[in-house]
Amino acid sequence: MIWQFGEIGYDISINDGDRVDKKPYKAPEYLKVAERKALYDTYAMLLKFRKDNPRFFDGDVNFRWAVGSSNQKERHIYSSSADGKHYALFGNFGTGTQTISVNLPSGVSKWYQYDNGAEWNGSSHSPSMAEGQFYLLVSDRSMCLR
């Protein structure tokens, strides 16, 4: 669930007045700020992925969520659908750059970045990732935005 204006980084507390009080509408003003526009675009991309790929969110899927017990700064989500398609989402949620060890599910030789179609070969990777950086990989290039 995205709280009202959460996709643009609203600048007052959610509890300002009350959680469900009407909040000032500032989206046109906020979207002129590059960082807020980037956040909005990220939400839009992830919501488009979900809308275009119900196979991963409804019905018969395998889902694996990995959060390091000693390192809460990285997250990994892997899912596969009954029709043989896969996605992997992983990111750095720490406050600085770090190397993330990624072991993608076996059985897929090529992965593609959802946002730009860049190829990832093999299953083992250790990308250096800036704080807040994430990758959404898919097993079929036709699922990519570009």
Predicted feature descriptions by range:
Residues 14-16, 100-102, 139-140:
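Short conserved micro-motifs at the rims of enzyme active sites and ligand-binding pockets
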Residues 2-87:
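Glycan-recognition and catalytic regions of carbohydrate-active enzymes
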Residues 46, 90-92, 111, 132:
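Hydrophobic, well-ordered secondary-structure elements that form the walls
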Residues 93-107:
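Surface-exposed beta-strand/loop patches in extracellular or lumenal glycoproteins
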